């Protein structure tokens, strides 16, 4: 599955990803029509939805968690969900800080976005709180296999130790 929650990503990356043999999804109807990909409706709320809707939750990763849940898995494994920004990150000043916000590096300038996020001591606390709401629901087993993750509401382990 390939999911992006901002239309700019699809506009920028479409030539590179259009032929990938993957389910491609977005939360924007216009973008879905433009590229012939699947539109996924959503709303702003905490936790997972068992209806066709997903929770927007400020990130594609959070949205993917809800999309995975719709497939009724026995277990979901998180990889790359650290929720950490550089300690010197300053979203209001549009300053990334001393390290990128994503495992793959920082977006190029045309794709950088500065959502309303609460970052405290380098931790994306707003998203961590949303994951806590998912944990409280207890709808599916979720294991966080992201080394050094700020998400502490799910059991964690090394990916190699999973069976």
Per-region residue spans from a language model:
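Metal-ion/cofactor- or nucleotide/acyl-coenzyme-handling active-site neighborhoods
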Residues: 1-163
């Amino acid at each position: 599955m390939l999911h992006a929650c901002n239309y700019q990503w699809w506009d920028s990356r479409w030539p590179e990803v259009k032929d990938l043999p993957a389910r491609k999804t977005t939360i924007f109807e216009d973008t879905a029509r433009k590229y012939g990909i699947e539109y996924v409706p959503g709303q702003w709320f905490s936790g997972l939805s068992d209806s066709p809707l997903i929770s927007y939750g400020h990130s594609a990763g959070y949205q993917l968690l809800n999309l995975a849940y719709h497939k009724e898995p026995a277990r979901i494994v998180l990889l790359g969900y650290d929720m950490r920004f550089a300690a010197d990150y300053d979203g209001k000043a549009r300053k990334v800080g001393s390290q990128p916000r994503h495992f793959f590096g920082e977006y190029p300038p045309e794709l950088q976005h500065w959502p309303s996020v609460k970052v405290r001591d380098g931790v994306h606390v707003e998203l961590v709180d949303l994951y806590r709401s998912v944990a409280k629901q207890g709808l599916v087993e979720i294991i966080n296999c992201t080394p050094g993750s700020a998400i502490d509401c799910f059991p964690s382990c090394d990916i190699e130790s999973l069976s």
